[in-house]
């Protein structure tokens, strides 16, 4: 799985990290499982900046995960 990350810095400090994960899925269960996996990984990132992960297929966004700086748990949404 490849991914592309983009960081937004102010005065050398990371404020927001956006990660796009392009992937091809073959069913809803794969989207759910992969989203859960990435959700768990995000909990290991520092909480000092906003982080968003967009999991997308060729045609559409499959799921979205977002955690605001300082929050303990990310928010996620899986699109139908």
Locations of the language-model features?
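Detector for Asparagine
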Residues: 11-13, 43, 80
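A short amphipathic beta-strand at an alpha->beta junction
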Residues: 45-67
């Amino acid at each position: 799985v490849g991914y592309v990350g983009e960081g937004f810095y102010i005065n050398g400090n990371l404020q927001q990290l956006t990660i796009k994960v392009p992937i091809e899925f073959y069913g809803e269960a794969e989207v759910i499982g992969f989203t859960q996996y990435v959700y768990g990984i995000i909990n290991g990132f520092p909480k000092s900046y906003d982080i968003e992960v967009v999991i997308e297929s060729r045609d559409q966004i499959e799921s979205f995960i977002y955690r605001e700086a300082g929050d303990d748990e990310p928010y996620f949404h899986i699109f139908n």
